[in-house]
Amino acid sequence: DGKQAHLSQAAKELPNKKNRIMLVPFEELLKALNIQCRTEKNGRKGVLKKGKYDYHGKTTRTTYKYSFATYIKKQYKRTNQASKKEYKRLLKSSGDVTDRFQYMRVDTFREIDPEVFYGYYNNQIEIYCRINKMSKKKSVLYGRKNAKALLGAAKKYNLDPVYFACQTFLESAYGTSTLAKGHKIGKKKVYNLYGIKAYDNNPEKYGFRYAKKKGWTSISKALEGAAAYLSSGYIHSKYKQNTIFKLRYTPNKGLWHQYASDPFYAEKIGGKYQEMSVCYSQGAKYLYDMPRYR
């Protein structure tokens, strides 16, 4: 369309007497042309799709209880898994590397393209299993049926489905963790995808005991349990932690009620969220909630 695009990696010209041949990094070219790429199966096949999605939306701001400098100190004191310099970057919106997806409101069910979602959902699991040298059948989440169940749980509890998929992948090691794969108690097998109530001194014992108590006897029931846990405990709770950023970096005084201890949690989920955003339907609406420090 005649617009200039800046490449982070320079193109290289090949010597050729007849034609001018330029080598451009594939991912850079797709980005410049606004083309979405999704690989399938064993990575030999893929789908190129002309970008038609506009992720622009309204932006609101949440006022935090502390100044920026004070908040950095308090986060560092609470969890020193990152340096103060790293916290400064993580907490400042200008340091965002997720294209604002860590600030996307996830307290609503956005419409997705089901076929794109099913393909991308399974592809993510396949990639994880291939990297970890295991069969995709080792994942209890794999398959169209489970992808549909995840969408159903997200809709029931009013969660963004793409976010919920990303969160579920992280919590369950893409459906391959011990708690996710389930355990038979009595006559029924139970599943705990998020490791809820799986206390450190004996996570399997307590995790499966809680799953039995809640009746998570199938993957669909375990997904509903996970969605209910996120919805009532965090995203739609009185704490209103309705973005990935606020789940990790609570605006509440005393740093009370943070979902994760990993300082890089919001970036990790946000990065995966950005990657899977191609699953949204063209008419999806977006709302961002950015932090404002005192």
Regions found by a protein language model. Name each.
Residues 1-58, 64:
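Primary recognition of N-terminal secretory signal peptides and signal-anchoring hydrophobic helices
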Residues 21, 142-149, 158-161:
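Short, glycine/acidic-rich beta->alpha junctions
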Residues 27, 31, 148-152, 165, ...:
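Solvent-exposed, polar/charged alpha-helical surfaces in well-ordered, non-transmembrane soluble domains
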Residues 29, 48-81, 226, 286-294:
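Intrinsically disordered, low-complexity repeat and linker tracts
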Residues 62-63, 67-143, 172-238:
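Peptidoglycan-targeting cell-wall enzymes and recognition modules
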Residues 151-154, 159-175:
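Short, functionally critical alpha-helical segments immediately adjacent to catalytic or ligand/cofactor-binding
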Residues 194-294:
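Non-catalytic cell-wall polysaccharide-engagement segments
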